[in-house]
Regions:
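Glycine-rich, small/hydroxylated-residue low-complexity segments
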Residues: 4-8, 16-361
């Protein structure tokens, strides 16, 4: 009797799992299409820095898995990035259907999920330099998990790579979002062994780079939160000898909403922690840019109008991509033209600077 009961339970679970897997599998393609539509609608509104179109192809839906390719096409190219019109960034996507994706079960995770996915960058004309820099390994690989409530988590693994004079070791970043909104996002990450070769005899190294960010969007228009990016244990090296050391270089951003008002305050802070030259400790410093009472709607309009104008300039004058001075002049002219949009809220700007010696004075 016990054996029959156990068999019945197993059969029931198999039916439930199979039915759930079939159902969640039917939700993948509509979800992909909605994501693409939202992305392309944002392009039409001028919210992207470049004229890009998102699409998918080769959708193959199985019972436990769905596979397809996601591709982002630069319609008019990106001259400042040496991207030609029509070039694409392509991703191979392998989705495991919920409610219990097999890979997650193999790792002991029995929490039901809508789907889990593996995303890999495709080696093509545009992305080939990334694969060469990573010594023919995939430069980035992503693992995603989508919950039934709309939240998601992503782990991004970064391969060691060397891009000319800049190199780094392996790294990993995690992204956790609420309601499938990239505006409500927690980010943590770390990359090891960073090297910037300034010349054959001079270089700057950092033991690691870390990032910790928590951001959300209130009422769909007020960005708030804080982030911290840090280069740890920096060494400035000349002819093989350490010239100076810095315990950490930190960049912090804080955004908070002004109470009972449609404004936000922004605080950008850069910190230099424990600068040492030879045997001499020179202290620590801090520089901040504080902007109070900023209208986020005005900032959004500024970015949109600026992006649209810059896209038109680059499309009409592709030679700007190879003329840094001319490009800076265009940037300055566009910034001046659309600056009145930012000045609607009449923000208050402060730039405090602090420095303490080794004695804390």
């Amino acid at each position: 009797m016990i054996r029959k009961s156990a068999t019945g339970v197993i059969v029931a679970l198999a039916v439930i799992w199979g039915g759930g897997t079939w159902y969640t599998g039917t939700q993948i393609q509509p979800g992909v299409e909605k994501f693409i539509k939202d992305f392309n609608d944002a392009k039409k509104k001028g919210e992207h820095a470049y004229d890009m179109t998102l699409s998918y192809q080769n959708f193959d839906k199985g019972f436990f898995n769905s596979r397809f390719q996601m591709q982002m096409t630069f319609d008019n190219g990106a001259p400042d990035l040496n991207i030609k019109p029509g070039q694409k960034v392509v991703f191979d996507v392998d989705v495991e259907h919920g409610p219990l994706p097999i890979t997650m079960l193999m790792h002991g995770n029995v929490i039901p999920a809508l789907a889990a996915a593996k995303v890999n960058l495709v080696n093509n004309e545009l992305t080939q330099p990334l694969f060469i820099a990573a010594k023919n390994k995939s430069p980035v690989e992503a693992t995603l998990r989508f919950a039934f409530g709309g939240s998601f988590s992503t782990t991004l693994d970064v391969a060691p790579a060397e891009y000319g004079k800049f190199s780094f070791g392996e790294g990993q970043f995690t992204f956790n979002g609420d309601g499938s909104s990239l505006s409500n996002l927690d980010i943590e990450g770390k990359v090891e062994d960073i090297v910037l070769q300034l010349s054959p005899m001079n270089k700057v190294t950092a033991k690691s780079f870390t990032i910790d960010s928590l951001a959300r969007l209130e009422e769909k228009k007020f960005p708030v939160g804080e982030s911290e990016s840090k280069f740890n244990q920096i060494n400035i090296i000349n002819h093989g000898e350490d010239v100076a050391q810095i315990d950490a270089f930190v960049a912090k951003t804080m955004l908070d909403r002004v109470k009972d008002k449609d404004y936000i305050n922004v605080n950008l802070t850069y910190e230099l922690d424990k600068l040492t030259k030879g045997n001499q400790q020179l202290g620590s410093g801090e520089w901040s840019l504080i902007a109070e009472s900023i209208d986020p709607s005005a900032v959004r309009q500024f970015i949109i109008q600026y992006n649209i104008a810059m896209q038109k300039q680059l499309a009409a004058h592709p030679e700007l991509a190879n003329d840094e001075v001319a490009l800076q002049e265009v940037n300055a002219a566009l910034f001046k033209e659309y600056l009145p949009l930012l000045q609607k809220s009449e923000p208050t700007i402060k730039q405090p600077v602090k420095w303490k010696n080794a004695l804390g004075e």
